[in-house]
Amino acid sequence: MAAAAPGPVELGFAEEAPAWRLRSEQFPSKVGGRPAWLGLAELPGPGALACARCGRPLAFLLQVYAPLPGRDDAFHRSLFLFCCREPLCCAGLRVFRNQLPRNNAFYSYEPPSETEALGTECVCLQLKSGAHLCRVCGCLAPMTCSRCKQAHYCSKEHQTLDWRLGHKQACTQSDKIDHMVPDHNFLFPEFEIVTETEDEILPEVVEMEDYSEVTGSMGGIPEEELDSMAKHESKEDHIFQKFKSKIALEPEQILRYGRGIKPIWISGENIPQEKDIPDCPCGAKRIFEFQVMPQLLNHLKADRLGRSIDWGVLAVFTCAESCSLGSGYTEEFVWKQDVTDTP
């Protein structure tokens, strides 16, 4: 996804794709599965990827590949969003930014091949940097199974989960450990995020369409009564209707990307003010970069005992200067707006 000055919005859609297209060397934008880390060193540690409320490891939700044209230090640039899988803790959200120059220690200077490479069918549990990844979630794994010394984990919780789901039997079979990674029912379903530019619709056209829809359904009501009804329309109704009108042409969109534009909100409640968005540690302001839409929830299959993680809008704000970080990851800011009981 190309990041530029405020302009047309890019819409993201979830589509199935072969696993090799979602690996790090392909610089993907994707939902679910394990993170396709960009920088392969100095990954966020377990402390940075733990829910602030319940302490459980966060699950990888999605990543967006968003290089900055004209910036040599951000020729490659990705944003990684994580969330807590526990429905009552869905506030546990963290987002990280990583960027690399074209000439770097991890990837070829030339664009990646468009064909599948050999050996890409196995789960990657160790990066080129030597860093080990958790067998359950694909995040940095400083813990090691004390018995086989070959299985690595981000936390005691994930080690226990893997032990219960098969590592207990595989632990003594050293030649099979890397090839026997069970389904831990922790990762979200994996999809590629494909993008297209949003069709430009003039605000006047949208307003006229909304007006026509309303007047068409209320054709017999006197003008004075319509004026009275309009005065009673709440700000909440107006914002929600604007949200619906904005997504009506592409109702399957799961993501809206536009660095420096304004997000669209689903509710008049809990809209952040400038003071609510913390500055980057470098001193620069943070600006809006993308938002995750509630339509993504349909793809996640996150229901558990009748409960599910939920949101209205997840809005991600990043450093306006996209400050240089070497090969490390820096945390950015995400704002969660819930769905209210809007008619």
UniProtKB/Swiss-Prot annotation:
Chain sites annotated for binding Zn(2+) 1: 134, 137, 154, 158
One of the Pfam families matching this protein, by short name: PDCD2_C
Positions that bind Zn(2+) 2: 145, 148, 167, 171
One Gene Ontology term of the molecular function aspect: zinc ion binding
Keyword field contains Isomerase: no
PTM info: Ubiquitinated by PRKN, promoting proteasomal degradation.
Mapped zinc finger ranges (MYND-type): 134-171
Presence of keyword Isomerase: no
Cited Gene3D superfamilies: 6.10.140.2220
InterPro entries according to UniProt: PDCD2_C, Znf_MYND
Full protein name: Programmed cell death protein 2
Species per Swiss-Prot/TrEMBL record: Mus musculus
